[in-house]
């Protein structure tokens, strides 16, 4: 690869990332050879089949959508299939998780002053990650009650759910899962949510 006037040698991950960027390779369609239909979360599969109103078998639905593909006579989940339907996608895709940290105060402290008061990691299929992280974040946010102009007590959340949930959904949907290092981290401070 050229960088300015010099050539630099790329490692395997950098080459693969470049191929994804150039659309020479499709991350979601790649097969996870160690996987099988046994890795499917049946609760999510059942819900999906109800939503699309089909009587097809799980295998037929997954194959038709490109989430289950054959290689050497055996069927394996694609990376998209694992993210959407897998029981434990982070086994195969380490960045497929969301960690929520709640801090005491307005800054992140470490060492003897560490101020993390809640720490939860969610690492199921993307649907369940969103569902469980949403429930947990809601349980950690404050609500404020005040008397409105009509003389009625009104309770409002610390942050509107539609706003922070949209941010979470965007982070999960637009995450580069080909990067095996970092996962999504949500930080809750006394004065903000990151």
Segments predicted by a language model, with ranges:
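Glycine-rich/acidic phosphate-handling loop/turn and adjacent ATP-lid/helix
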Residues: 193-194
């Amino acid at each position: 690869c050229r960088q300015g006037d010099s050539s630099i040698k790329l490692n395997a991950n950098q080459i693969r990332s470049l191929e994804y960027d150039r659309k020479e390779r499709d991350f979601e369609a790649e097969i996870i050879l160690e996987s099988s239909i046994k890795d499917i979360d049946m609760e999510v599969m059942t819900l999906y089949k109800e939503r699309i109103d089909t009587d097809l078998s799980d295998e037929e639905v997954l194959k038709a959508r490109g989430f289950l593909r054959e290689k050497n006579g055996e069927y394996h989940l694609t990376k998209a299939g694992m993210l959407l339907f897998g029981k434990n996608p982070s086994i195969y895709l380490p960045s497929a998780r969301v960690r929520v940290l709640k801090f005491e105060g307005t800054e992140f402290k470490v060492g003897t002053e560490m101020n993390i008061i809640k720490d939860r990691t969610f690492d199921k299929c993307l649907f369940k990650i969103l569902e469980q992280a949403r429930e947990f974040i809601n349980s950690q946010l404050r609500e404020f009650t005040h008397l409105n102009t009509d003389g009625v007590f009104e309770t409002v959340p610390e942050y509107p759910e539609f706003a922070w949930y949209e941010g979470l959904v965007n982070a999960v949907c637009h995450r580069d899962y080909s990067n095996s290092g970092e996962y999504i981290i949500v930080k809750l401070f006394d004065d903000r949510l990151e």
